[in-house]
Design a protein with these regions (language model features):
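An acidic, low-aromatic, low-complexity terminal/linker signal
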Residues: 1-176
Length: 176
């Protein structure tokens, strides 16, 4: 049995292995970031850190999610960083048996390598996503994560790091 979080995006059932998920949180409106990929909604504060939030509908289907009360943010780990995936709703944690999994035939290829496999259920087909491949090669997202990492390290700086000509800078940005 394999535990997965099943959720909806564009009314399609999608899933991620539970070990890839840090937490599921209530939807909150992200602060927009200029000049990022169209599927990056912005950032929120999560566990005292800045968390980029991705509109999964926009990433997968090219259409923005219409905001509503059932929306959630799934916090996942990608490339040693955390991302929030905005989804329409959460179906729940489901145990899938190995007989439910179906991989693609060698003759049939899925152009998008972020589809890990298909899962057959009584209510239809669930697409298991490969979170590691979902944003692979996205330069804008990589730059955003690097900028957030830099900002995180800037939080650790002390007053001594902010001097002009060896003089501390006061709160009005005037050298003393």
């Amino acid at each position: 049995m394999e535990k997965q979080i099943v959720f909806f995006s564009k009314e399609q059932q999608l899933s991620l292995p539970i070990e890839k998920i840090e937490k599921i949180i209530q939807w909150q409106q992200p602060i927009p970031i200029p000049e990022t990929s169209s599927f990056v909604l912005g950032v929120i504060e999560h566990n005292k850190h800045v968390l980029p939030v991705i509109d999964l509908n926009a990433r997968l289907y090219g259409t923005e999610t219409v905001q509503h009360k059932e929306m959630k943010i799934i916090v996942v780990q990608w490339n040693d960083e955390f991302l929030g995936l905005s989804v329409e709703s959460i179906k729940g944690i489901v145990d899938f048996g190995s007989t439910q999994f179906e991989w693609m035939d060698n003759e049939v290829t899925v152009e998008k390598n972020y589809i890990e496999k298909f899962i057959k259920t009584e209510s239809g087909i669930v697409i298991q996503l490969n979170i590691d491949s979902l944003f692979e090669g996205n330069i804008m997202l990589d730059k955003l994560l690097r900028a957030l990492e830099t900002a995180k390290s800037d939080e650790e700086k002390t007053e001594e790091d902010f001097t002009i000509n060896s003089e501390p800078v006061d709160e009005t940005c005037q050298s003393k």
